[in-house]
């Protein structure tokens, strides 16, 4: 890292602009001190999940999710069955793996860490096997 980064609860600046309209985001400052190599954000939901996210993938080399509160359920290409994370659970997702968030609690809060900080999200026209 190129600098110390400390963020307190008083520093929290929640931003409704992010990947999902039903959530808000708080940048945890890693992108600034790593010159964009690593991103970290605190995400919390604002309203009930209306529908699954749909199959998509992220253009990143590393993706880690840690659940602070609530739960969420994924489907991943190449993984049989659903994967549910609850408070205290973490998941390291391989780069580029198609996935679909099919359920989440209304009180969900997570920390996401990704590499790089800025990345693209690509929707898939069709679900991958075996979900077709």
Regions found by a protein language model. Give the residues of each.
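A short, N-terminal "cap"/entry segment at the start of jelly-roll beta-barrel domains
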Residues: 1-47, 121-132
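Short histidine-centered beta-strand/loop micro-motifs
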Residues: 17, 51-59, 76, 83-84, ...
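Flexible, glycine-rich phosphate/dinucleotide-binding loops
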Residues: 34, 81, 100, 119
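A short hydrophobic beta-strand segment most commonly corresponding to one strand
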Residues: 38-41, 92, 105-122
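Hydrophobic/aromatic beta-strand elements that line small-molecule binding cavities or substrate pockets
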Residues: 42-44, 89, 99
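Short, conserved beta-strand element in jelly-roll/cupin
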Residues: 42-45, 57-78, 113-116
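A generic "binding-loop/recognition-motif" signal
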Residues: 60, 79, 97-98, 106-107
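Short acidic-glycine-tyrosine-enriched beta hairpin
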Residues: 78-96
